[in-house]
């Protein structure tokens, strides 16, 4: 978007360590971090018994420092999985809840003049989008990550960004066997979308 980006080895180290950009970076990358980042933390508790197994998990999503500090609430994927290896009718049950509505709040709150306006910023994380890279977290118009975040290839106005990244969904899945020759999988996903904080 903005022409040539910083590309020295020092800039590479800034990107992989999530550090602020140097003098050659845009003002935005000097205030936040250099480059575009999507970060995830995975937490899981599991139980294995003789007749059944259970797993509870949370995958925290964030795209900047405010999210790494969990200032984006409970955004991410919450799930439970139950497996019954000895009970073929229902071998596995999965229940998941995903929410990306908080995004550290609706406003970015980072003023570019930090000497005149010191303090913490954050908010308006705008998942999957990036101010420096207009195609955001996509590859040839397709979302890299959750398939529930509508890919830019579906934008009727041909814009390259993500227009609906604030979602809430519930996902249910069953897997089993009705007989030795008949397996089944049932899946149901119910979702709502709220566009972006800016929309």
Question: Where do the model's predicted regions map?
Answer:
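C-terminal structural cap/anchor segments
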Residues: 106-197
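Signature for the C-terminal beta-barrel architecture of outer-membrane proteins
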Residues: 1-113, 170, 190-194, 198
């Amino acid at each position: 978007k903005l022409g040539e980006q910083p590309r020295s080895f020092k800039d590479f180290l800034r990107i992989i360590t999530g550090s602020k950009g140097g003098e050659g970076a845009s003002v935005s990358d000097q205030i936040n971090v250099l480059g575009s980042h999507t970060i995830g933390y995975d937490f899981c508790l599991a139980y294995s018994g003789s007749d059944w197994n259970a797993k509870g998990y949370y995958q925290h999503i964030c795209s900047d420092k405010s999210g790494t500090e969990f200032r984006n609430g409970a955004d991410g994927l919450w799930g439970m999985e139950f497996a019954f290896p000895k009970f073929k009718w229902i071998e596995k049950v999965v229940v998941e809840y995903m929410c990306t509505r908080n995004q550290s709040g609706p406003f970015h709150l980072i003023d570019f003049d930090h000497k005149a306006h010191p303090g913490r910023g954050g908010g308006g994380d705008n998942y999957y989008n990036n101010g420096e890279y207009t195609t955001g977290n996509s590859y040839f118009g397709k979302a890299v990550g959750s398939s529930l975040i509508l890919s830019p290839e579906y934008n009727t106005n041909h814009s390259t960004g993500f227009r609906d990244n604030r979602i809430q969904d519930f996902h249910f899945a069953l897997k089993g066997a009705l007989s030795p020759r008949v397996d089944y999988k049932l899946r149901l996903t119910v979702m709502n979308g709220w566009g972006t904080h800016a929309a």
